[in-house]
């Protein structure tokens, strides 16, 4: 991290977390933030569920919820971006305060509740984005007051799919009441059938991923793997934030919401490895949760991920983190004799299954 980035983070950390979040997006949009540019190599370039990525380090949904800073983020060293979640209608989300830094734990807790500008506005921004080598996907959500949340996911995809490179069905946010109930076998099967029917009508392929929670039993994971394999989706994103609070030291540790960051790394990686085992490599996995270094990205890949995503670590290490991780990952692949990311996927899975 350079001096300018460190100074900017210090200033942001003196502010309310949600205001700092908004200010960081404004700074990106205005061109005030020095950006590292694209990062790729023959080892880093990879294909995940039909997506051709310059590198496997992606931006998780939740940072640029409303797709307002895409041009800048495409120059920040990420291999792919995910915006949203978008819901059919705009909604304000939960009351503030709803975002908390857990500095001692290198973590955050949020209870945003799918606050966003709505599918129509976000779709328009996706349509206007610059085209380039960095795929941009949309996280699909449901309105809090919707009488048919499963239909909401299909509706957002129908509206925005033509302007997105991929889509992620988010049934795992802990901040919308009973949303996680849609991870059950029957509900998930019906939901994915509706989404895939919409996808089948597109003129070009739009890979659909499913984002799951880290707080699932082994039986739940087995059911999800079975449904996912049968549904025709492109892959699984593992995982969203957790409701667990094990070992936290921060004063905000008991705030309601989803916990992200360093404390999630082990839990989410174990879920990832188990899914890799259950799907036997037949379904690409994207590893999310606690990635803050090249070594942690590499561990996720060796546990079974074809790519990774990050967000919370940027709160503590700045916008240049993705590029640093991608370059470090390239060096680790070279060190261990892997000619590509794909060659390394799952080679350390057994370490996470004990």
From Swiss-Prot:
Bilayer topology: Peripheral membrane protein
Positions that bind substrate: 65, 110-114, 170, 175, 240-241
Pfam family, one: DHO_dh
Cofactor: FMN
E.C. code: 1.3.5.2
Chain residues that bind FMN: 61-65, 85, 139, 170, 211, 239, 261, 290, 311-312
Active-site feature positions: 173
Subcellular location: Cell membrane
Keyword Nucleus: no
Annotated cofactor note: Binds 1 FMN per subunit.
An MF annotation (GO) of this entry: dihydroorotate dehydrogenase (quinone) activity
GO aspect biological process, one term: 'de novo' pyrimidine nucleobase biosynthetic process
Keywords attached to this entry: Cell membrane, Flavoprotein, FMN, Membrane, Oxidoreductase, Pyrimidine biosynthesis
PROSITE patterns noted in UniProt: DHODEHASE_1, DHODEHASE_2
Enzyme category, top tier: oxidoreductase
Entry-linked InterPro entries: Aldolase_TIM, DHO_dehydrogenase, Dihydroorotate_DH_1_2, Dihydroorotate_DH_2, Dihydroorotate_DH_cat, Dihydroorotate_DH_CS
HAMAP family to which the protein is assigned, alphabetical: DHO_dh_type2 (MF_00225)
Assembly mode: Monomer.
Role summary: Catalyzes the conversion of dihydroorotate to orotate with quinone as electron acceptor.
Family the UniProt entry places it in: Belongs to the dihydroorotate dehydrogenase family. Type 2 subfamily.
Protein name as it appears in the record: Dihydroorotate dehydrogenase (quinone)
Classification lineage: Bacteria, Pseudomonadati, Pseudomonadota, Alphaproteobacteria, Rhodobacterales
Gene it is expressed from: pyrD
